[in-house]
């Protein structure tokens, strides 16, 4: 490969902060994005199964998890923007070239995701009614429209396959000319996906099993804390969580082995590196999660911490994934992301962290606390004065941010 060509494609404006900042933020935000994706896939799959079941516990779980999946899609989309932007900053020629090679599929991704989301909302509409004030309530009886859930799940998996292929293509610059001009004939249509690795795709999709199992362990404890009286339903959720945790660990390990066996030549170094062994730590935790929850069944903190631990383990996997990309592109194209030119932009850096920490912190704290408290109240929930103040501050932070956005823009334009 002509390494000087790739170095010439670096953005002459440089990165607005040290590249290490983007690498770390990329890992963390990708892990959070994948956690939301895995919750979405797992709850959507369980909701689809429950919608076709005659078991009343499955039917009840279908209604609850279908609503969870709907929210998880929104969270996954929001959290997916940040890692995408970080990749574009420090791996720009690789990401953009891969996008162009499969341009039709990238554009199709947006359409497929939209249809999948609409299908999920169609199911939600079939199973909920609305009061005059707009308050939704679940319709009685068995869930309706299970085919909408199944269709949504299938389309979400298609979205995952598209993004998987595009990322894979970006790591194989030596193949770009073969894909763009096979046999010397230029094919500029972007209608093909050129690099589908079943093991890699399955690995990230199957992570939804242990992650959703951890979600169910927390859900079980949440129901008990909310004075749930149907203990048969609680036991049903617990049994399902244990089964998913055990099966998920085995399947993720098998998919990982398949992925390692199918690594292309420029990534084979990873098999004998210490990073592969580090990647086994999260899988080992997933395998032990069921045992830990059985031993700590009465530990409230432990039940909730199962999901927190899956986030930490996903961050570990995301870090190992980033090492694979970093070293592969360093060897294949001489691309060292840490050598990226730095043109320090303190205002944009400050705006990012203020947005992420202040706006994100206030709004998430308010929404999560509100959801938590209201879910544990059988009657109409009235927020405390302290929580109401947090909500007021959250709204005020949004107003200030939007106003600041336009004020800064006006100042820059009018210099």
Label for each model-derived stretch:
Residues 131-281:
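Long, contiguous internal "core" modules enriched in hydrophobic/ aromatic residues
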Residues 3, 326, 403-415:
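Juxtamembrane boundary at the C-terminal end of a transmembrane helix
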Residues 1-3, 173-190, 325-344:
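Membrane-interfacial helical/loop segments at transmembrane boundaries in membrane proteins
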Residues 1-73:
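N-terminal signal-anchor module of multipass membrane proteins
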Residues 72-151, 253-287, 408-409:
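Membrane-interface helix-loop-helix modules in multi-pass inner-membrane proteins
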Residues 20-34, 97-110, 184-205, 271-276, ...:
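Short aromatic-rich membrane-water interface segments that cap or initiate transmembrane helices
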Residues 70-79, 148-170, 247-252, 302-321, ...:
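Hydrophobic alpha-helical membrane-insertion segments
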Residues 43-68, 85-96, 123-141, 214-243, ...:
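Juxtamembrane membrane-water interface segments of multi-pass membrane proteins
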């Amino acid at each position: 490969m002509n390494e000087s060509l790739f170095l010439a494609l670096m953005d002459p404006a440089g990165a607005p902060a040290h590249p290490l900042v983007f690498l770390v933020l990329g890992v963390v935000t990708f892990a959070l994005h994948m956690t939301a994706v895995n919750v979405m896939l797992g709850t959507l799959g369980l909701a689809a199964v429950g919608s076709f079941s005659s078991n009343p516990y499955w039917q009840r779980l279908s209604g609850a998890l279908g609503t969870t999946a709907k929210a998880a899609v929104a969270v996954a989309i929001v959290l997916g923007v940040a890692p995408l932007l970080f990749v574009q900053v420090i791996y720009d020629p690789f990401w953009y070239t891969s996008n162009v090679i499969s341009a039709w599929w990238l554009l199709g991704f947006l359409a497929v995701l939209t249809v999948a989301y609409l299908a999920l909302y169609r199911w939600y509409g079939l199973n909920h009614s609305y009061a005059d004030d707009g308050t939704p309530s679940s319709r009685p009886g068995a869930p309706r429209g299970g085919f909408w859930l199944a269709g949504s799940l299938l389309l979400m998996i298609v979205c995952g396959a598209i993004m998987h292929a595009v990322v894979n293509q970006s790591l194989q610059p030596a193949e770009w000319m073969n894909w763009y001009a096979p046999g010397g004939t230029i094919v500029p249509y972007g209608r093909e996906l050129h690099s589908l690795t079943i093991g890699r795709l399955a690995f990230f999709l199957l992570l939804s099993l242990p992650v959703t199992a951890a979600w169910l362990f927390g859900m079980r404890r949440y129901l008990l804390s909310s004075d749930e009286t149907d203990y048969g339903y609680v036991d049903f959720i617990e049994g399902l969580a244990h089964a998913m945790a055990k099966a998920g660990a085995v399947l993720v390990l098998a998919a990982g082995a398949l992925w390692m066996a199918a690594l292309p030549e420029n990534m084979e170094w990873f098999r004998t590196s210490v990073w592969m062994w580090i990647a086994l730590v999260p899988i080992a935790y997933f395998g032990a999660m069921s045992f830990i929850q059985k031993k700590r069944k009465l530990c409230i903190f432990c039940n909730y911490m199962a999901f927190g631990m899956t986030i930490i383990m996903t961050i570990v996997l995301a870090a190992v994934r980033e090492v694979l990309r970093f070293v592969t592109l360093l060897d294949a194209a001489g691309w060292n992301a840490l050598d990226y030119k730095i043109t320090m932009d303190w205002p944009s850096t400050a705006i990012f962290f203020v947005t992420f920490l202040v706006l994100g912190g206030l709004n998430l704290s308010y929404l999560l606390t509100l959801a938590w408290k209201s879910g544990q109240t059988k009657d109409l929930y009235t927020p405390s004065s302290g929580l109401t103040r947090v909500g007021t501050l959250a709204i005020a932070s949004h107003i200030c941010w939007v106003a600041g956005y336009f004020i800064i823009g006006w100042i820059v334009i009018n210099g």
